[in-house]
Amino acid sequence: MIIKINNKRNKIAKEIRDIFQASYTIEAEMLKAIDFPPLKRTISQFLNSNSEFYAYYLNQNIAGVIEINNNQDLTHIQSLVVYPRYFRKGIGRKLVQFMLDTYKSRIFTVETGLDNHPAIKLYKSFDFQEQHQWDTNH
């Protein structure tokens, strides 16, 4: 089940941060990133975020979260995270499909690491197309 969650509540903000830490730790290792900004996000930053957060619940527990920034013309996937124990179970795919079905923007965007092959494969399966590559010091 996918539902919108209220990141302005302390308990929810902590749950969001916990899943971000678990998922982005794996991505940082995959990308060989030493300094990885998603891992630096604080509970306070989640509490104060204007993004929209949706959670995929499995057995009454959050298994995945998608963070969306939306305006009329553009919807951006700010983050898509899944607890590592639920990797390769289709949760990320269901969250992306939910976002595409829910938002009626003309343009959908996402950014991911060049070496994050599972994420790239997922986004390409929804016809996302690479537009740019950036070199970072992460």
Protein language model regions, located:
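Conserved catalytic-core motifs of GNAT/GCN5-like acyltransferases
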Residues: T109-T112, Q129-H138
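A short helix-loop-beta-strand connector motif used in the catalytic cores of GNAT acetyltransferases and
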Residues: S44-A55, H76
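Conserved GNAT acetyl-CoA-binding A-motif
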Residues: V96, T102-L114
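Conserved acetyl-CoA-binding loop-helix of GNAT-fold acetyltransferases
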Residues: V82, R88-D101, K121-S125
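Short glycine/proline-centered loop/turn elements that form peptide/ligand docking sites
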Residues: G92, V96, D115-A119, T136-H138
